[in-house]
Amino acid sequence: MKNDIKKVRNIGISAHIDSGKTTLTERILFYTKRIHAMHDVKGKDGVGATMDSMELERERGITISSAATFCTWGDHEVNIIDTPGHVDFTIEVERALRVLDGAILVLCAVGGVQSQSITVDAQMKRYKVPCVAFVNKCDRSGANPARVVEQLKTRLGHNALLMQLPIGLEADFQGIVDLISMKAVYFDGAGGELLRTEAVPESLLPEAISRREELIDSVSLFSDSLTEAILEGTEISEVMIMEAVRQGTLERKITPVFIGSAYKNKGIQPLLDAVTRYLPCPADIENSALDLSREEAPVQLTSNTEDPVVALAFKLEDGIYGQLTYIRVYQGILSRGATVVNARDGKKVRIGRLVRMHADQMEDIEAIHAGYIGALFGLECQSGDTFAAQGLNLAMTSMFVPEPVISLAIVPKDKKSMVNMSKALNRFTKEDPTFRTHLDPETSETIIEGMGELHLDIYVERIRREYNAEVTTGNPRVAYRETITQKAAFNYTHRKQTGGSGQYGRVAGYIEPLSDEDFLFENKITGGAIPTQFIPACEKGFRMSMAKGPKMEFPVTGVKVVIDDGAFHAVDSSDMAFQAAARGAFREAYNKAKPVILEPIMKVVVETPNEFQGAVMGLLNQRRGMIVGTQDEGQTCVIEAQTPLAEMFGFSTVIRSATQGKAQFTMEFSAYRQVPQSIAEKITEEVAKRKKSAA
C-alpha cells in the first residue's frame, strides 16, 4: 500500500440487473493488469467473471455478494466493490455504499433508467455518494445514450452532463469523442487495450463543439478561474474544465456521463481516468461517528493516520479460510496485533491476520491505513460493528437495515440434512442482517424470512449446494396475533392431590387491554394473601400464557394483568402450583375479555409511471389496501398504502404484469390492526382445520 490518501479511490459499481456491471468490472481488472485474461459473465468458456466467485452466481449470471477487490491505474489505487443489482439483495448495495467514497452508476444504452436504477440512486442519495454515470452497451441494437442522459435528468433529477459523444452506434459503434480534449479516441488490439487518438470526424464536429460549450457553461459555476476565462475571452485550458467538473461532482451538483461498451472493450480506459480525476479520495469526504458516551452526539472523523483508529466491519463471509471480515478504516491505522474495542458489546479484540482481497484470493498486509479497505481473520463480530481504539466510545452511524417481508417454512429431509441446514442458517443470518430465522413453536418448523422470493430462493439453493442438505419449502404464512378488548376478572384455584404433598394456589384479580406495551404485570396483593416469594411464579405463569392464546393459539399482545388477592397452603404451595394457577386464571378471564385477532399491516410504497397510476390503485384496493397518499414526481408517481400482509403474497408478479414491469414497490411492517369480522371467521376455520389434521 502506498498510503498516499489523495491517490486512493474507494468506488462501487451500482446498476440495474443486466446493465453489464460485472462485465465492466472484469474489463477494469484486465486493463489495470489485475487479471490477464477476460471471461464473460455467461460466456461460452464456462469460466464466468472473476468477481462472480460463488458457483450459484456463475450459473445464474447474476451477482449476489459484493466482492471487494483493488487495482492500480496510473499512480492511483482503486478499491472496487462489485454490488448486486437485484432488489432482493439491496442490503449488499446499502452496505457497500456505506463504505464507499464514490460510485459508477451503470446504465444500459437501450433500457435507460430502470426501476432498480431508481432504488440504487435513492440509496446513493441517502449516503451522499458522488457518482459518475457510464452508459454501457452502446453496441446494442436500439442504443441511444442521449435519451439515457435525458432520463437521468427527468427521472432521477441528476444534472447529467455528457463528457463524450459516440462515434457511430449499435453495430457501427467505433469509439468516442472526448469533449474536453476534443479528440476522437479509438480502441484497437484484441482486447481494446491500444488507444488511438485522432481528429474529431468532420460529421461530428458541429455537435461536438456545441456540446463542449454546453459542458463549459454548466461547470463554470464551480470554478472562478473558468468563469473569468469565459468572461475575458482568454484561453480555456483542459485542466480548468477538469477541476470544475471535479468540484461539481464532489458537491453532487453534476453527474458526468461517459459512454462505451464493456463487452466490446470500448470506453473503459477513459472511464478509469474519470474515476481518478473526478471521484473523491477519502479525505474529500466528511465521515462522522456517534459518541455513545454523549447521547450519540456526532463526532467528525479525520483521515489522519496519527489519530486513534476507527473502523467499520461492513461484510462477513465464511470462506474456505474461516470467517473473513471486510473492514473500512476511517481514521488512524489498524495494525496487526493491535487491541481495539467493539462498540456494540464493549469487548476488547486483538487484531490477527490482515489481508487485501481480490475477489476470492488474498495477500497478507501489516496494517490498513485510514481511507483503505481490507479484510481480517478470526474476528467474532456482526455486520455493521464499529471497532475503535481503547478509550473511544464511538459507533459509525448504524446502517439502515430493511425489515424482512416474506417468510416460509423449510423442512430438512433427514437428520444429516438437519445438522447441515442449521450450520448454513447460522452462517447466513450472521452474514446478512435481512435474512432471519426462527422456530415456529406450533408446527416446530424452521421459518426463514427475507427481502423477497428471489432472496429466499437463493438461500434455499445455497443450503442445498454448499451444505449438501436436502430441504423442502412450504407456502408463506402470516404472523397473526390476538388481543383483548375489555376488562375481565379472574379468581382461580389450582388444587392437585397426588399422594404426599399436593399442589395448591389461588390467584384473583383482573386483565385489561393495554395499548402501548405487549405485557404489563402489576402486584396489588396486601396482607400476604400470596407470599412474596411466589409473586415471580405468578408473573411467569401469565407470561407463558401470552405465548399462545387460548382462543386461536396465536401469540397474545397488549394485556395488563393485575393480581389483588389469593391464597396459599403452608405445605402444598410452590412455584409450580402458582404458575399453574396463573395459567388457569388467564384462561378463565381471557374468554370473558372479548378477544380479537390482529394482523400485520404493511406500509406499501409503489413507484409507477403515471399511465399505470389507476391500475396500481385498483390493485391495492382489491387487496384491502387503504391509500394514504400519492405524490407526483414528473413522469412517475409514488403511491403509499397501508395493506394487510396476508393480501400481499404474489403481488410482485401481479404488479409486474399490470405495469409491463415498469413499477416497483417496497414493503415494510407498519403496525398490527384488528382483522375484519368476515376475515376473522375464515382464519378461525383454517385454524380449526389445521388442529383437526394435526390431531
UniProtKB/Swiss-Prot annotation:
Residues annotated as binding GTP: 15-22, 82-86, 136-139
Compartment(s): Cytoplasm
GO cellular component: a single term: cytoplasm
Annotated disulfide bonds: none
Pfam families, per database record: EFG_C (PF00679), EFG_III (PF14492), EFG_IV (PF03764), GTP_EFTU (PF00009), GTP_EFTU_D2 (PF03144)
InterPro entries according to UniProt: EFG_II (IPR041095), EFG_III (IPR009022), EFG_III/V (IPR035647), EFG_IV (IPR047872), EFG_V (IPR035649), EFG_V-like (IPR000640), EFTu-like_2 (IPR004161), G_TR_CS (IPR031157)
Alphabetized SMART domains for the sequence: EFG_C, EFG_IV
Keywords from the named record: Cytoplasm, Elongation factor, GTP-binding, Nucleotide-binding, Protein biosynthesis
Residue ranges constituting the tr-type G domain according to the UniProt record: 6-284
Chief place where the protein resides: cytoplasm
Keyword Protein biosynthesis: yes
GO molecular function, one term: GTPase activity
SUPFAM superfamilies, sorted: EF-G C-terminal domain-like (SSF54980), P-loop containing nucleoside triphosphate hydrolases (SSF52540), Ribosomal protein S5 domain 2-like (SSF54211), Translation proteins (SSF50447)
Stored PANTHER family: ELONGATION FACTOR G, MITOCHONDRIAL
Function: Catalyzes the GTP-dependent ribosomal translocation step during translation elongation. During this step, the ribosome changes from the pre-translocational (PRE) to the post-translocational (POST) state as the newly formed A-site-bound peptidyl-tRNA and P-site-bound deacylated tRNA move to the P and E sites, respectively. Catalyzes the coordinated movement of the two tRNA molecules, the mRNA and conformational changes in the ribosome.
Family, similarity comment: Belongs to the TRAFAC class translation factor GTPase superfamily. Classic translation factor GTPase family. EF-G/EF-2 subfamily.
UniProt-recorded name of the protein: Elongation factor G 1
Annotated organism of origin: Syntrophus aciditrophicus (strain SB)
